[in-house]
């Protein structure tokens, strides 16, 4: 029995016009016209699909920044309202959970749910954490860092999500 072995460079996503795995972060996002064209979707393998014209902000991928003065998480949650989001800090982790019940859209009914967990640096001041949702659906979780040697205040608590009326100033990478 012959088994085809693919080189690792073949499996990497080298750009928006190269194939990506079926079960990547875009799974369940809906279909585009090019997803239905058989010559594009099965050119390489039936388990690969083209992810054309997708941007980082449309993908739900988060961005974590940690510099000398602060720690910031940017997360695209454009399909959720502040009431659908729960943000809480437990020990050294921040947990962001989003869920909305089934609702109707242009193509039928849809429900969404996600759960993200991030480790907080040990020097983040947990008493001064904040979380806001911009008008364009970008969730920003941030907290200042304290100088080393001071207590960062570790405990479990919920962080309220405030709504901003202006779009996010997060970079699009």
Swiss-Prot record:
Q: Which organism is it from?
A: Tapirus indicus
On this chain, the residues bearing N6-acetyllysine are 70, 99
Q: Which residues form the sHSP domain?
A: 52-162
Write down the Gene3D superfamilies for this protein, in alphabetical order: 2.60.40.790
Listed binding positions for Zn(2+) 2 are 107
Q: Which UniProt keywords apply?
A: Acetylation, Chaperone, Cytoplasm, Eye lens protein, Glycoprotein, Metal-binding, Methylation, Nucleus, Phosphoprotein, Zinc
| Annotated glycosylation sites | 162
Please give the residue ranges the record annotates as the region Disordered. 144-173
What does this gene product do?
Contributes to the transparency and refractive index of the lens. Acts as a chaperone, preventing aggregation of various proteins under a wide range of stress conditions. Required for the correct formation of lens intermediate filaments as part of a complex composed of BFSP1, BFSP2 and CRYAA.
What GO molecular-function term can you cite, just one?
A: structural constituent of eye lens
Question: Binding residues for Zn(2+) 1, per the UniProt record?
Answer: 100, 102
Spell out the residue ranges making up region: Required for complex formation with BFSP1 and BFSP2. Answer: 1-63
- Subunit description: Heteromer composed of three CRYAA and one CRYAB subunits. Inter-subunit bridging via zinc ions enhances stability, which is crucial as there is no protein turn over in the lens. Can also form homodimers and homotetramers (dimers of dimers) which serve as the building blocks of homooligomers. Within homooligomers, the zinc-binding motif is created from residues of 3 different molecules. His-100 and Glu-102 from one molecule are ligands of the zinc ion, and His-107 and His-154 residues from additional molecules complete the site with tetrahedral coordination geometry.
InterPro entries this protein is in? A-crystallin/Hsp20_dom, Alpha-crystallin/HSP_16, Alpha-crystallin/sHSP_animal, Alpha-crystallin_N, HSP20-like_chaperone
**Chief localization class?**
cytoplasm
Any one Pfam family here would be Crystallin
Residues bearing PTM Phosphoserine: 45, 122
Positions of post-translational N-acetylmethionine modification: 1
Positions modified as Deamidated glutamine? 6, 50, 90
Bias class Basic and acidic residues marks the residues at 153-167
- Highest taxon in the source lineage: Eukaryota
Official protein name in the record: Alpha-crystallin A chain
